[in-house]
Amino acid sequence: MISMKRRMLLGSAGVALAAPMIMTRAAVAQQSGAETSMDIDHAMPPETHRFNVGKFEVVVVKDGARPSEKPQETFGTNQSPETVGALLEANFLPADKFVNSFAPVLVNTGSDVILFDTGLGEGGRQNGLGRLVEGLTAAGYKREDVTTVVITHMHGDHIGGLMEGGQPAFPNARYVTGQAEYDFWVDPARVGTPAENGQKGVLANVKPMAEKMTFIGDGGAVVSGITGMAAFGHSPGHMIYRIESEGRQLVLTADTANHFVLSLQRPDWEVRFDMDKAAAAATRSKVFDMLATDKLAFLGYHMPFPAVGFVEKVDQGYRFVPKAYQFDI
């Protein structure tokens, strides 16, 4: 098993070796006259965040971030643009723009190195995304160290990094995913439907690993201390995962909520990417009611990096409370 000392040394070396490239990219951005905070973010080494859940080490990697306009076309699609904009402004956010970030997670149990989702991979790199492997390297992990890859669901921003150059990106890994999710996406009935394009990605990136896959359902174990929970709606077999070690817990909520304001404060608002919008809304309320009631920490794939926090029940939904030093003491 890779040691903490080695990880820290490798992480420091990665930053040092990256420095000339950072300077080159920054210089190019400045010369273009169009440098933004996103340009700077893409030029820097990928952000990583490390903390412990009991004896388990958790490393969050920022695979990238993508700014977009017209948030009401993605979130609150059953609301007026004015209503969506007003909620954003009430939370000190612009009414006409939003940023979507992507946060795969690695959990080192001491005997297993488990990666949850793989980001956008090669297809995102021309836009400054797909930085998972780069981030893992900065954190002291090689692709070969990963023993298990868990796929929460099979949308492109979660499975895009499964393959690298036509070969498995994590060559020593076995794979775990939900049975219902896999069955939906490989079904030939998807051809000719809105899911056909997504199916192409699954057939290219997921199906080649089918012989190395373990399929689970609600309550299925990945390893001791990590349990799958059905959270259907965002996709037909969307799964979330409870991590527990030495009495500490963290729930990986994947895409149950995709925005820390628009999805959490208004869990009943429809989201364009939710495949079954009514089921997704019901799942949001169920999952975040549990987290708020039990005061459990969660990590959401699209929450503001490092994507970890808690939720407090408020009038119409939930308030996101970012992680501070709870896991450090």
Q: What is each PLM-predicted segment?
A:
Residues 135-141, 145, 172-230, 282-286, ...:
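Metallo-beta-lactamase
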Residues 23-59:
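C-terminal segment of N-terminal export signals and the immediately downstream linker at the start
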Residues 55, 107, 117, 146, ...:
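Divalent metal-coordination and catalytic microenvironments
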Residues 5, 246-329:
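Cap/insert and terminal regions of metallo-dependent hydrolase folds
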Residues 2-3, 8-30:
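N-terminal export signals
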Residues 63-64, 118-121, 154, 180-181, ...:
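Active-site metal-binding loops of divalent metal-dependent hydrolases
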Residues 96, 104, 126-176:
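Active-site metal-binding motif and surrounding structural segment of the metallo-beta-lactamase
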Residues 47-139, 240-256:
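Conserved beta-strand hairpin/beta-sheet module of binuclear metal-dependent hydrolase folds
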